[in-house]
């Protein structure tokens, strides 16, 4: 009888432990793989974000070194088979070949087509990449005796406003934003277990971001900053900034949407002479934001990670 009681106690303890693990499994982990721009900046790879929720590992945009950054993050790359593109600018897609092809190399972890979502042109992009790497793909397939050949193909889907993916309790919604033209740029909302994350993508001030981000747990928003004198003296800088959300505008978005935590990624800073890769410009940008927004906001850094549960916690 005593042994039976002890066994029952151990079972209860084990079940409690499993409950705690399941609660932990109910969170969303967000890792900023790249927070930069097209500029060559060793401190900031170009834009990419990794979302881990339950059994899903989803990448949003694949900037420079996205796959290497994903490896550094400690994510389960065996589950990385889905890439969502906000738009088709080079700094958001330049890492696709690495993400796509590395999944087939030994030790290979993908035997099914690589799934890709994006705006108009995404199917042409996938077809072009497949053609560009056709010689390499053929050699790899022969090396592995024809096994997993499907893993070298793309399954590309053009997105529109609305749900674009749903599996294992994870929902991904795309919403159009204004960056450089109509129907060419999107943001994403990711929902899982009652938690939510919004990625603005590259955008100017857009009411659609506000619509989808109201009350969100974590809002990852891009920002573009140049001093007034730079905008006045350099037309190129002014045109570039016209495609991005200014600090005061982002502060307004944060004020209206009231996320539990706001984070900056894809941080564009210019002086009148050109790109400013120093921290000085970033600090000035943050000062402008804090003039009108006093809520929690973080200047994102590469490989910074957040856990979205009952609260939003910065992990590193």
Regions found by a protein language model. Give the residues of each.
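Positively charged n-region of N-terminal signal peptides that target proteins for export
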Residues: 1-6
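Flexible, glycine- and charge-enriched loops at secondary-structure boundaries
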Residues: 9, 89, 240-243
């Amino acid at each position: 009888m005593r042994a039976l009681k002890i066994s029952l106690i151990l079972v209860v303890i084990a079940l409690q432990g499993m409950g705690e693990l399941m609660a932990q499994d109910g969170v969303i982990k967000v890792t900023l793989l790249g927070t930069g721009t097209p500029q060559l900046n060793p401190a900031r790879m170009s834009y990419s974000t990794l979302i881990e929720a339950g059994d899903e590992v989803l990448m949003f945009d694949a900037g420079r070194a996205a796959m290497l950054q994903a490896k550094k993050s400690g994510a389960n790359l065996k589950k990385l088979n889905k890439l969502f593109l906000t738009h088709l600018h080079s700094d958001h897609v330049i890492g696709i070949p690495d993400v796509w092809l590395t999944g087939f190399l030994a030790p290979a972890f993908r035997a099914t087509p690589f799934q890709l979502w994006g705006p108009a042109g995404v199917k042409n992009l996938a077809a072009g990449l497949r053609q560009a790497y056709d010689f390499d793909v053929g050699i790899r397939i022969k090396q592995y005796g024809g096994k997993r050949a499907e893993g070298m193909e793309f399954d590309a889907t053009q997105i529109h406003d609305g749900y674009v993916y749903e599996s294992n309790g994870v929902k991904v919604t795309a919403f159009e934003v204004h960056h450089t033209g109509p129907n060419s740029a999107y943001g994403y909302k990711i929902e899982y277990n009652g938690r939510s994350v919004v990625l603005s993508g590259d955008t100017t001030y857009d009411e659609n971001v506000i619509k989808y981000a109201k009350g969100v747990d974590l809002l990852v928003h891009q920002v573009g900053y140049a001093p007034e004198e730079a905008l006045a003296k350099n037309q190129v800088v002014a045109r570039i900034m016209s495609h991005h959300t200014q600090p005061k505008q982002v502060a307004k978005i944060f004020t209206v949407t009231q996320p539990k935590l706001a984070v900056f990624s894809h941080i564009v800073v210019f002086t009148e002479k050109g790109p400013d890769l120093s921290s000085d410009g970033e600090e000035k940008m943050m000062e402008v934001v804090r003039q009108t927004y006093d809520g929690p906001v973080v200047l994102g850094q590469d490989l910074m990670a957040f856990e979205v549960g009952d609260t939003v916690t910065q992990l590193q």
